Amino acid sequence: MICGTDEAGRGPIAGPVVAAAVILDPDNPIEGLNDSKKLSEKKREKLSLEIKEKALYWAIAQSDPDEIEAINILWASMKAMQRAVEALPVKPDMVLVDGNRVPELKVPAKAIVGGDASEQCIAAASILAKVERDRQMLKWHELYPQYEFDKHKAYGTPKHLELLEKHGPCPIHRKGFNPVKRLLANL
């Protein structure tokens, strides 16, 4: 069994990094899988439901902003992917990882640059991770509406930076990330 894993949320300046691990059913293909960044939100939502229904196994895990601050975004991403793979109810024979590094795993793993566009199982993981992270950011928006997380999902857009400057950071902002770090240095 081949597992694909990927993360979503390395670039934003707030919120968790979320990872998913997916083992697809070769006898039950899913049409339209691709890198989550190349799909519309509506398409990702639709595919996310189909992946959860048709995949043999899937799991989602994350690293929260405090962990990101403690160990940096790269290692937090690796930890989230490791947790997602370990949360599967079975041990895969091989794990394909999007990117150029592999997390510490108890099974063989291979890094594939651009794997979210070339490997169906990684694309599926990419979609699950992105949809879950976006949902979490909508929940954070309910708690902190002044940052408009519902619009930019915590990426450093001009509007988000403007709101960050106006209101200061909230508890889920990544204080070690440059726009937030600069703001805190000037307080």
Curated annotation (Swiss-Prot):
CC cofactor: Mn(2+); Mg(2+)
Record SUPFAM superfamilies: Ribonuclease H-like
Binding site for a divalent metal cation: D6, E7, D98
UniProt keyword Calcium present: no
CDD domains for this protein: RNase_HII_bacteria_HII_like
Organism domain of life: Bacteria
Catalysed reactions listed for this entry: Endonucleolytic cleavage to 5'-phosphomonoester
GO process terms (BP): DNA replication, removal of RNA primer; mismatch repair
Gene Ontology cellular component annotations, sorted alphabetically: cytoplasm; ribonuclease H2 complex
Protein name: Ribonuclease HII
Organism: Idiomarina loihiensis (strain ATCC BAA-735 / DSM 15497 / L2-TR)
Gene behind this protein: rnhB
